[in-house]
Amino acid sequence: MDPCDCSKSGTCNCGGSCTCTNCSCKSCKKSCCPCCPSGCTKCASGCVCKGKTCDTSCCQ
């Protein structure tokens, strides 16, 4: 089960049934919620987003 703390500008529920709405997670695993902006390459190890732009700091 991936931890997800997303109370900033959206709602994330990472549990048995994961839901993600307007998510701006800083530590949300890709397997739970796709928190990277559309067009960003998803990371195999998980997605860490810093903002809503698609650059090298979006996923690491």
Swiss-Prot record:
UniProt name for this protein: Metallothionein A
Family: Belongs to the metallothionein superfamily. Type 1 family.
Gene name of this polypeptide: mta
Pfam families for the chain: Metallothio (PF00131)
Keywords of the record: Metal-binding, Metal-thiolate cluster, Zinc
GO terms assigned for molecular function: metal ion binding
The organism of origin for this protein: Gymnodraco acuticeps
Role of this protein: Metallothioneins have a high content of cysteine residues that bind various heavy metals.
Lineage: Eukaryota, Metazoa, Chordata, Craniata, Vertebrata
Binding site for a divalent metal cation 3: 14, 18, 23, 28
Positions contributing to a divalent metal cation 2 binding: 6, 12, 14, 25
InterPro entries, per database record: Metalthion_dom_sf (IPR017854), Metalthion_dom_sf_vert (IPR023587), Metalthion_vert (IPR000006), Metalthion_vert_metal_BS (IPR018064)
